Amino acid sequence: MQTLSSAPDPAASIAVTILAILLALTGFGLWSAFGPKAKKLTDPWDDHDD
C-alpha cells in the first residue's frame, strides 16, 4: 500500500499524462468542430465542381 510520502508509480504517471493529452486533443477537436469558429469552416466536397 502506498502512502503519501512514497514516490508514485512511474507507469501510473505516464498513463495519467497520456490520458490527459488524449482528453485535451479530443476537447480541442470538438471545440474546433462545434465551437464559435466552426461557422467559418467550409466543406471541400461542397466547394468542388463536378
UniProtKB/Swiss-Prot annotation:
In terms of InterPro entries, this protein maps to: PSII_PsbN
Give the signal peptide range.
none
Protein localization:
Cellular thylakoid membrane
Name the UniProt key words of this record, in alphabetical order: Membrane, Thylakoid, Transmembrane, Transmembrane helix
GO biological process per UniProt: photosynthesis
Top-level taxon? Bacteria
Mark the transmembrane ranges.
14-34
| A Pfam cross-reference name | PsbN
GO CC annotations? Answer: plasma membrane-derived thylakoid membrane
According to Swiss-Prot or TrEMBL, what is its membrane topology? Answer: Single-pass membrane protein
| Function per UniProt | May play a role in photosystem I and II biogenesis.
Which family is annotated? Belongs to the PsbN family.
Task: Report the protein name in the record.
Answer: Protein PsbN
Query: What's the gene?
Result: psbN
